[in-house]
Amino acid sequence: MYSSKQHVNILTALLVAHGIRHAVVCPGSRNSPIVHNLNECPEIQCYPVTDERSAGFYALGMIQKLRQPVVVCVTSGTALLNLAPAVAEAYYQQMPLVVVSADRPLEWIDQLDGQTLPQPDALGRFVRKAVTLPEPHNDDLRWYCNRLVNEALITRHGPVHINVPITEPLFDYTVSELPAERKITWTPADISPTTLNHVTRMFLQSKRPLLISGQPMNPLFDEAVLMIGDDERYVPDFVLYIGGSIVSKRLKRFLRKAKETWVVNATGEVTDTFMNLTHVVQGDGEAVADHIRYMLVTEPHPFVQLWDDLLLRVRQMSEAYKPAYSQMAVVKYFESRVGDEAIVHYANSTAIRLANSFAKHPVFCNRGVNGIEGSLSTAAGCSVVSDKEVYCVIGDLSFFYDQNALWNQNLQGNLRILLLNNGRGGIFNMLPGLEQSPARDAFVAAEHHTSAEGICRQNDIVYLRADGPQDLQQAVDTLLYIDSNRPVLLEVFTDVADDERVYRDYLSVFR
């Protein structure tokens, strides 16, 4: 029988899954659920050592002989600190020492409770990875716990620290078997032909494979997922994910239905966006994608064709939609006029979501953390090292937040700004339930009545404006084609209620 502590059982199951076969265990009550589990596992041989400092080196000696990861398990408090010499030695020898420390609950740290000190990151830079496991009480926390243990155990070339806070009761051993836990596997850098062929074979042999590029051109995935609805024919069983973060929350929720995901990235980081990651391949995602595309030419896959047909229908419907005057109409017209080779920066929030639907060329956007600050400065920085026009499509809050980007003597006439001003953060009108809060407009969406005209005047920026459909096309064309040695800004004023209504109407086309 195993401990009743879910995170201890998740940890134990994954230690076994990742091939841990030896554990040095030290005495204590707080770590007793972990020690009990390790002793119960027929796959793991336990070796008791009383002195923690000595125990760390016992484990190190085993690693040197076995060339395998070995666990050293200690109780809470200074017991962990006694491992520091062995951990430092393992770090410089690049030995896979797995430190598992029991801990007191977070709320009791620094409260003069016994054997209690801040244990997360206590081993500092001498470990390659340090994680602290939550005590799960829902599916999200169980997934998080699984992910953290996997992240630690696939870390290479040095020691790792897994810290396990455990609440009382400690001595309840009523679980008959360990959970079946998802194991994440890691493949090293420099994708070999063998690895490339293996990934491609996994893709082509799956019944419903889907290749997802994090930031593709004109993906229309939001619209496609709306069209799919509850049609299970489109749900993939295997997702190959490359590239950066995905804009569409709806797509991310949809892909969490898949059975498994493989991620290809340059760093080998565990990015479990869809909560079903099973394999991390460190390497060039574009090389993998290009190889799969090449193979699909000679071996067309019916599921890929099903999705291609769907996306073609979605694109045709999107192109046929005629939005009333709104921010959507502005961006759609702008994208119909700007060249395919244009350098276009989109700010976050509503702007990038409109680009997701209507941009047919590569776009730039700060989608690392997705903040509203710095979008204009990023476009400005691009413009000073480019001999082409650089466009920035930006909402009012992002613009006013970053207006100092225009306070720079290096700016030239190749910087063109399309400012979408509806007097607030319009995306907050799209969040269901927020309309019930009287604080939404003034405090959440930052409602305002500000114009960029004065900012342009003080920074010698050519200022244009459009207030309605009668002005729009001429104003956008002027922004695109005017000859100027100074930056040009077009401020388009829309009504936030119209923007919301048009956006919802557009999405309804695909339901």
Give, region by region, the residue ranges found by the protein language model.
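Phosphate/pyrophosphate-binding active-site segments
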Residues: 1-3, 255-350, 455, 466-511
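Thiamine diphosphate
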Residues: 100, 107-120, 357-511
